[in-house]
Amino acid sequence: MVTGWHRPTWIEIDRAAIRENIKNEQNKLPENVDLWAVVKANAYGHGIIEVARTAKEAGAKGFCVAILDEALALREAGFQDDFILVLGATRKEDANLAAKNHISLTVFREDWLEDLTLEAPLRIHLKVDSGMGRLGIRTVEEARQIETTIASDNQLQLEGIYTHFATADQLETSYFEQQLAKFQTILTSLKNRPTYVHTANSAASLLQPQIGFDAIRFGISMYGLTPSTEIKTSLPFELKPALALYTEMVHVKELAPGDSVSYGATYTATEREWVATLPIGYADGLIRHYSGFHVLVGGELAPIIGRVCMDQTIIKLPREFQTGSKVTIIGEDNGNAITADDAAQYLDTINYEVTCLLNERIPRKYLH
């Protein structure tokens, strides 16, 4: 995708915030528990390569991604010897590519292991479906059979076993405890304990540090975002958001009563008012549902009016502003702030989606 360096819309990533979130999490982990930085989906919209570099500087011992291509991008960017685990499903025909690049793969079907052609040992993490209902084996019998199959092939290594919690970001823990018990039953059924046993995502690592096992997968909270609003007041330390989104007014005009703006003429001025056009739209991740939300101009709230367009958005100004004035979509401005959580609440979604939607057409600038 083309990145818009010649357009006054940009994202700022505070690397110091990422480092602080990692350090605070590491301070509460036992010394023998590694922290793996989850950098899938372009690091939740923050930029995979720069975030990976920042996380490694802060002490992360490895990385988790969703697809093999993300793992290969890290290798190509210079992360040659770092642990990398692909959490999602990988095609069988790509197993050799992963093996040659020393990339660990998630496996959850015995038939996937049959008739592999490998030029290097393949590191495998067995995924257990303890209650998420996505990928994973569900029985002791499946686990034992896969362990036997791996042991019979000297090109296969059972490096890890893991699961993913569906409700770790909730205060009620009964389902979480059921999942943990199911996972432990399968774990103890193995003849040999793998090198890495890991279960904790951000929420679990923050609220249930006792189940760290050998490593945690630190994702959303590395970026300073709360796993859910429900647990926000129960966190052991303050998270520092790393992402801010800015743009500038490219056209400022005064509307007369009866003037309408944007597609469908859904907004009509009822009095004389100032509006500004912003060079950002739903093609950038500022989806149409943002209509009716607000931004900050000079620290004051300014509503988004009319329909958000593919490349442009219109806001109602509290007064006349100069063309080129800075606009804050996510971030702080003169003592006021709009957070990813604020946007998520308005959009009836989660903060993960808000930042992941911000695509690579918006340039990232890395600070500190």
From Swiss-Prot:
The active site is at 40 (proton acceptor), 263 (proton acceptor). Its cofactor is pyridoxal 5'-phosphate. SUPFAM superfamilies: Alanine racemase C-terminal domain-like, PLP-binding barrel. GO terms for molecular function: alanine racemase activity; pyridoxal phosphate binding. The modification N6-(pyridoxal phosphate)lysine is found at residue 40. Keywords: Isomerase, Pyridoxal phosphate. InterPro entries: Ala_racemase, Ala_racemase/Decarboxylase_C, Ala_racemase_C, Ala_racemase_N, Ala_racemase_pyridoxalP-BS, PLP-binding_barrel. One of its GO terms (cellular component) is cytosol. The keyword Nuclease does not apply. It catalyses: L-alanine = D-alanine. Substrate binds at residues 134, 310. Pfam families: Ala_racemase_C, Ala_racemase_N. It comes from the Bacteria. One of its GO terms (biological process) is peptidoglycan biosynthetic process. Pathway: Amino-acid biosynthesis; D-alanine biosynthesis; D-alanine from L-alanine: step 1/1. Its EC number is 5.1.1.1. Belongs to the alanine racemase family. Catalyzes the interconversion of L-alanine and D-alanine. May also act on other amino acids. This is Alanine racemase. It comes from Listeria monocytogenes serotype 4a (strain HCC23).
